[in-house]
């Protein structure tokens, strides 16, 4: 009888880590960034608005789950957005999307953040199906932009991260279902 609890613990430790899945893309339920454990808050699908073409699956990682976009945006805590592309996208289209997202969400901070946006756009390269773009915010560093597994830029500033993450979590996301999924509100496929 005393061996049963030990056996149960051993079995639980042997189970694979849980993961989130959407549209055939699987992301881990937890990541560690600079010694900080982040949990998957939610997954969302970016659809091109005109033809409803799937572009990427995004996963939002935060220190503590929340369905409140303002709480996530205003928290000076580590967060990460991972985009796994489900189709090829050229660097010019990526830069256009970043610029449009800033235009829709930056408000009166747009001019002050132009340098950071230019740095973000310059970090882009053409991406293919299954490529990753990862945006990681650490309060003492800023946003690290990683494209295809390589760090491409570091952009300091809490204002920059707030506007950047508001592209997905703010009032004007590319598509509402993407924001709702990242906030853990949308049903997963």
Describe every region a protein language model picked out.
Residues 1-4:
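Positively charged n-region of N-terminal signal peptides that target proteins for export
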Residues 14-16:
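N-terminal signal peptide c-region/cleavage motif recognized by signal peptidases
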Residues 24-27, 137-141:
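A short, compositionally biased
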Residues 63-140:
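Mid-length scaffold segments of soluble, non-membrane domains
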Residues 147-149:
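Short strand-turn-strand beta-turns centered on an Asx-Gly dipeptide
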Residues 152-178:
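Flexible glycine-rich active-site/ligand-binding loops centered on an Asp-His dyad
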Residues 177-189:
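Cysteine/selenocysteine-centered motifs that mediate thiol-based redox chemistry or coordinate metal-sulfur cofactors
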């Amino acid at each position: 009888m005393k061996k049963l609890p030990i056996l149960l613990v051993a079995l639980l430790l042997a189970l694979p880590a849980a993961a989130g899945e959407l549209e055939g893309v699987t992301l881990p339920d937890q990541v560690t960034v600079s010694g900080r454990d982040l949990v998957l808050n939610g997954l969302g699908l970016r659809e091109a608005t005109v033809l409803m073409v799937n572009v990427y699956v995004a996963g939002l990682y935060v220190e503590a789950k929340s369905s409140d976009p303002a709480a996530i945006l205003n928290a000076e805590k580590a967060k990460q957005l991972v985009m796994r592309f489900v189709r090829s996208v050229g660097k010019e289209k990526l830069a256009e999307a970043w610029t449009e997202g800033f235009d829709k969400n930056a408000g009166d901070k747009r001019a002050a953040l132009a340098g950071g946006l230019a740095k973000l756009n310059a970090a882009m390269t053409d991406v293919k199906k299954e490529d990753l773009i990862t945006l990681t915010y650490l309060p003492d560093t800023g946003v690290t932009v990683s494209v295809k597994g390589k760090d491409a830029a570091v952009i300091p500033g809490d204002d920059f991260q707030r506007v950047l993450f508001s592209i997905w979590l703010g009032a004007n996301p590319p598509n509402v279902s993407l924001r709702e999924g990242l906030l853990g509100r949308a049903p997963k496929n």
